[in-house]
């Protein structure tokens, strides 16, 4: 993942970007 907002990632919902 590498977004700048909450999105549905392959691992689930990411609150913010990681890398």
Swiss-Prot record:
<comment type="similarity">
    <text>Belongs to the periviscerokinin family.</text>
</comment>
<keyword id="KW-0964">Secreted</keyword>
<keyword id="KW-0527">Neuropeptide</keyword>
<keyword id="KW-0027">Amidation</keyword>
<dbReference type="GO" id="GO:0005576">
    <property type="term" value="C:extracellular region"/>
</dbReference>
<dbReference type="GO" id="GO:0007218">
    <property type="term" value="P:neuropeptide signaling pathway"/>
</dbReference>
<protein>
    <recommendedName>
        <fullName>CAPA-Periviscerokinin-2</fullName>
    </recommendedName>
</protein>
<comment type="function">
    <text>Mediates visceral muscle contractile activity (myotropic activity).</text>
</comment>
<feature type="modified residue" description="Valine amide">
    <location>
        <position position="19"/>
    </location>
</feature>
């Amino acid at each position: 993942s590498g977004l700048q907002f909450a999105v549905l990632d392959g691992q689930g919902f990411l609150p913010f970007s990681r890398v």
